[in-house]
Design a protein with these regions (language model features):
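Active-site environment of divalent metal-dependent phosphoester hydrolases
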Residues: 10-15, 37-41, 57-62, 88-94, ...
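Helix-adjacent hinge/juxtasegments
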Residues: 49-92
Length: 168
């Protein structure tokens, strides 16, 4: 499975199309990590799955009357992906609360936004974070802010997990 990972478009819907155009093949889904949900309207009539979470600047949703969740846990084959914007877990001050929340969900990948800073870090099984002990390795990723031309890609297959960064 291949995913385009976007966050923090902040009104730059045009950059969503540009990031999609750079992909070698159509992703299985767009994972949107908040702050610009209304920008996803550019994908409304395209045949592409969109999985959004709400950010601190998302006062309106993609579809009237619906609200995007603050967290989404995706199960893809043997993998679990936890998506969040991160503002409710204080990610600008550190990742401890977000990783502890993830440890409870037992996810393999934690995707977040909010800081606008690209990040990729592997945490080992057995690490203690905010009182939680990770039961398995965890890949923590932030694609950076799409408004700054940054995005991510996530590939999951039977050989493992690969996260990459892209720029416009």
């Amino acid at each position: 499975m291949e995913y385009l990972v976007l966050s923090d478009s902040h009104g730059r819907a045009d950059l969503i199309d540009r990031a999609l155009a750079l992909q070698l093949r159509a992703p299985d889904a767009v994972l949107f990590l908040g702050d610009g949900i209304r920008d996803l309207r550019v994908l409304e009539y395209q045949d592409i799955c969109v999985r959004p979470v709400r950010g601190n600047c998302d006062f309106y949703t993609l579809f009237e009357g619906q609200s995007a969740p603050e967290h989404v846990l995706l199960e893809v084959g043997a993998y679990r992906i936890l998506m969040m914007h991160g503002h409710t877990h204080g990610v600008k001050g550190g990742m401890e609360r977000a990783v502890a929340f993830d440890a409870q969900a037992e996810a393999d990948v934690l995707l977040y936004g909010h800081t606008h800073l690209p990040r990729q870090e592997w945490l080992d099984a057995g690490e203690r974070v905010a009182g939680q002990i990770l039961q398995k390795p965890l890949l923590v990723c932030n694609p950076g802010a799409l408004q700054d031309g940054r995005f991510g890609t996530l590939t999951l297959n039977n050989q493992g997990i690969l996260f990459g960064f892209g720029s416009l």
